[in-house]
Protein backbone atom coordinates (compact mmCIF):
# COMPACT_ATOMS: atom_id res chain seq x y z
CA UNK A 1 0.00 0.00 0.00
CA UNK A 2 1.32 3.41 -0.93
CA UNK A 3 2.16 5.38 2.22
CA UNK A 4 0.20 8.42 0.99
CA UNK A 5 -2.94 6.32 0.60
CA UNK A 6 -2.40 4.74 4.02
CA UNK A 7 -1.82 8.15 5.61
CA UNK A 8 -5.08 9.47 4.13
CA UNK A 9 -6.90 6.32 5.27
CA UNK A 10 -5.66 6.55 8.84
CA UNK A 11 -6.56 10.26 8.95
CA UNK A 12 -10.13 9.46 7.87
CA UNK A 13 -10.28 6.58 10.34
CA UNK A 14 -9.15 8.83 13.18
CA UNK A 15 -11.83 11.40 12.36
CA UNK A 16 -14.43 8.62 12.25
CA UNK A 17 -13.22 7.12 15.54
CA UNK A 18 -13.68 10.48 17.25
CA UNK A 19 -17.24 10.67 15.92
CA UNK A 20 -17.94 7.09 16.99
CA UNK A 21 -16.74 7.86 20.52
CA UNK A 22 -18.87 11.00 20.65
CA UNK A 23 -21.98 9.15 19.43
CA UNK A 24 -21.19 6.04 21.50
CA UNK A 25 -21.51 3.77 18.47
CA UNK A 26 -19.72 0.86 20.10
CA UNK A 27 -20.24 -1.68 17.33
CA UNK A 28 -18.72 0.53 14.64
CA UNK A 29 -15.97 1.65 17.03
CA UNK A 30 -14.95 -1.97 17.61
CA UNK A 31 -14.98 -2.74 13.90
CA UNK A 32 -12.92 0.29 12.91
CA UNK A 33 -10.47 -0.04 15.80
CA UNK A 34 -9.67 -3.65 14.96
CA UNK A 35 -9.55 -2.95 11.23
CA UNK A 36 -7.10 -0.10 11.76
CA UNK A 37 -4.83 -2.31 13.87
CA UNK A 38 -4.85 -5.15 11.36
CA UNK A 39 -4.38 -2.80 8.39
CA UNK A 40 -1.21 -1.39 9.96
CA UNK A 41 0.22 -4.89 10.29
CA UNK A 42 -0.92 -5.87 6.80
CA UNK A 43 0.93 -2.85 5.43
CA UNK A 44 4.11 -3.88 7.23
CA UNK A 45 3.80 -7.44 5.93
CA UNK A 46 3.39 -6.26 2.32
CA UNK A 47 6.01 -3.51 2.29
CA UNK A 48 9.56 -3.79 0.95
CA UNK A 49 11.38 -4.77 2.99
CA UNK A 50 8.56 -6.63 4.72
CA UNK A 51 8.15 -7.11 8.45
CA UNK A 52 6.16 -9.62 10.45
CA UNK A 53 5.98 -8.22 13.94
CA UNK A 54 3.01 -10.26 15.13
CA UNK A 55 3.84 -13.47 16.91
CA UNK A 56 1.78 -16.68 17.11
CA UNK A 57 0.53 -15.70 20.56
CA UNK A 58 -0.66 -12.36 19.17
CA UNK A 59 -3.00 -14.21 16.82
CA UNK A 60 -4.08 -16.59 19.60
CA UNK A 61 -5.10 -13.63 21.76
CA UNK A 62 -6.96 -11.95 18.89
CA UNK A 63 -8.91 -15.13 18.17
CA UNK A 64 -9.70 -15.61 21.88
CA UNK A 65 -11.02 -12.03 22.04
CA UNK A 66 -13.22 -12.58 18.98
CA UNK A 67 -14.61 -15.81 20.47
CA UNK A 68 -15.20 -14.24 23.87
CA UNK A 69 -16.97 -11.25 22.32
CA UNK A 70 -19.22 -13.49 20.25
CA UNK A 71 -20.06 -15.92 23.04
CA UNK A 72 -20.59 -13.31 25.77
CA UNK A 73 -22.22 -10.44 23.86
CA UNK A 74 -19.30 -8.34 25.04
CA UNK A 75 -17.95 -5.03 23.79
CA UNK A 76 -14.34 -6.13 24.22
CA UNK A 77 -12.01 -5.37 21.33
CA UNK A 78 -8.31 -5.00 20.62
CA UNK A 79 -5.79 -2.80 18.99
CA UNK A 80 -2.13 -3.49 18.31
CA UNK A 81 1.02 -1.49 18.69
CA UNK A 82 3.68 -1.72 16.00
CA UNK A 83 4.99 -4.91 17.61
CA UNK A 84 3.44 -8.09 18.93
CA UNK A 85 1.55 -6.46 21.81
CA UNK A 86 -2.23 -6.65 21.99
CA UNK A 87 -4.06 -3.84 23.77
CA UNK A 88 -7.43 -5.01 25.07
CA UNK A 89 -10.15 -2.35 25.14
CA UNK A 90 -13.49 -2.68 26.91
CA UNK A 91 -16.13 -0.58 28.66
CA UNK A 92 -15.69 0.02 32.38
CA UNK A 93 -18.99 -1.79 32.95
CA UNK A 94 -17.36 -5.05 31.77
CA UNK A 95 -14.19 -4.67 33.84
CA UNK A 96 -14.67 -7.60 36.25
CA UNK A 97 -15.74 -10.07 33.54
CA UNK A 98 -12.94 -9.04 31.19
CA UNK A 99 -10.27 -9.19 33.91
CA UNK A 100 -11.42 -12.73 34.69
CA UNK A 101 -11.26 -13.59 30.97
CA UNK A 102 -7.74 -12.17 30.75
CA UNK A 103 -6.61 -14.18 33.78
CA UNK A 104 -8.26 -17.42 32.69
CA UNK A 105 -7.77 -17.29 28.90
CA UNK A 106 -5.19 -14.73 27.78
CA UNK A 107 -2.44 -14.69 30.39
CA UNK A 108 -1.16 -18.05 29.11
CA UNK A 109 -0.20 -16.28 25.86
CA UNK A 110 1.58 -13.38 27.58
CA UNK A 111 5.35 -13.45 27.89
CA UNK A 112 6.19 -14.77 31.37
CA UNK A 113 2.48 -14.43 32.19
CA UNK A 114 2.91 -10.66 32.49
CA UNK A 115 0.38 -8.08 31.38
CA UNK A 116 -0.42 -4.48 32.23
CA UNK A 117 -3.83 -3.19 33.33
CA UNK A 118 -4.38 0.45 32.47
CA UNK A 119 -7.25 2.90 32.17
CA UNK A 120 -8.07 6.26 30.65
CA UNK A 121 -6.62 9.13 32.62
CA UNK A 122 -7.60 12.76 32.96
CA UNK A 123 -5.20 14.09 30.35
CA UNK A 124 -2.07 16.18 30.63
CA UNK A 125 -1.83 18.62 33.49
CA UNK A 126 0.82 21.32 33.96
CA UNK A 127 3.23 20.71 36.81
CA UNK A 128 4.05 23.52 39.21
CA UNK A 129 7.58 24.71 38.68
Question: Over which residues does each language-model region extend?
Answer:
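C-terminal nucleotide
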Residues: 1-129
Amino acid sequence: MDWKIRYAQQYQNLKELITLLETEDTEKFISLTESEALTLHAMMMTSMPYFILMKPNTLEIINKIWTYRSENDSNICFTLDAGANVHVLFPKSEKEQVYEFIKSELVAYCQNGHYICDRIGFGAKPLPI
